[in-house]
Amino acid sequence: MAAPRISFSPSDILFGVLDRLFKDNATGKVLASRVAVVI
């Protein structure tokens, strides 16, 4: 799931935050699906 262009990108940080949301709440699932649509 690493970004193909650069080693560090906002997407990597975002995925890290979403990963925490997945473990904390099911709300992370909704956020992740919205982000997936945006990306």
UniProtKB/Swiss-Prot annotation:
Name this protein carries in UniProt: Lysis protein
Domain of life of the source: Viruses
Organism: Enterobacteria phage Ox2
BP GO terms, sorted: viral release from host cell by cytolysis
Gene name, Swiss-Prot/TrEMBL: T
Keywords on record: Cytolysis, Host cell lysis by virus, Viral release from host cell
Pfam family, one: Phage_holin_T
